[in-house]
Curated annotation (Swiss-Prot):
Function: Hemagglutinins of uropathogenic E.coli mediate adherence to the upper urinary tract. These adhesins bind to the Dr blood group antigen and also agglutinate human erythrocytes in the presence of D-mannose (mannose-resistant hemagglutination (MRHA)). C1845 is a strain responsible for diarrheal disease.
Protein's recorded name: F1845 fimbrial protein
Gene name of this polypeptide: daaE
UniProt cross-references to Pfam families, sorted A to Z: Adhesin_Dr, Dr_adhesin
Organism superkingdom: Bacteria
Protein's organism: Escherichia coli
Length: 159
């Protein structure tokens, strides 16, 4: 009996020691994504609007975009227009046919912002959260109908 018990124990040790473990997928995959940003993170919202051509008069509101600037201690939050949306003196929305609709931006809370060469920036540094209004700049009732787009990227202003 002792011999049989020793043989059985040895057999178990051999079986356990020689077994190969394998991974068997049986669930879902989780993904971890990390976005590394500048310290001053400026998030810019979206707006979609429809206006009749007859409404494209000076100061007519097109809409407001939400803007949140965090981690901007001492830095000036800024919005930069795409190269197709400005020239040396004007900011504009562009159509697929490259028609231009002049617009202007203004913070709705009355805070002081400055525009120059495609960049709309807060004149004081620090965090900010609020809305920026987009409105028609000048009488533009002669513009062709169609979809016009203004792309603004959040960032910060450096001197």
């Amino acid at each position: 009996m002792k011999k049989l018990a020793i043989m059985a124990a040895a057999s178990m040790i051999f079986t356990v020691g020689s077994a190969q473990a394998t991974f068997q997928a049986s669930g879902t995959t989780g993904i971890t994504t990390l976005t590394v940003t500048e310290e001053c993170r400026v998030q810019v919202g979206n707006v979609t609007a429809t206006l009749a051509r007859s409404k494209l008069k000076d100061d007519t509101a097109i809409g407001v975009i939400g803007v949140t600037a965090l981690g901007c201690n001492g830095l000036q939050a800024a919005l930069q227009a795409d190269p197709d949306n400005y020239d040396a003196t004007n900011l504009y929305m562009t159509s697929r046919n490259h028609d231009k609709l002049n617009v202007k931006l203004k913070a709705t809370d009355g805070s002081s912002w400055t525009y120059g060469n495609g960049v709309f920036y807060k004149t004081e540094g620090g965090n900010w959260g609020g809305h920026v209004g987009i409105s028609v700049d000048g009488n533009q009732t002669d513009k062709p109908t169609g979809e016009y787009t203004l792309n603004l990227t959040g960032g910060y202003w450096t001197n």
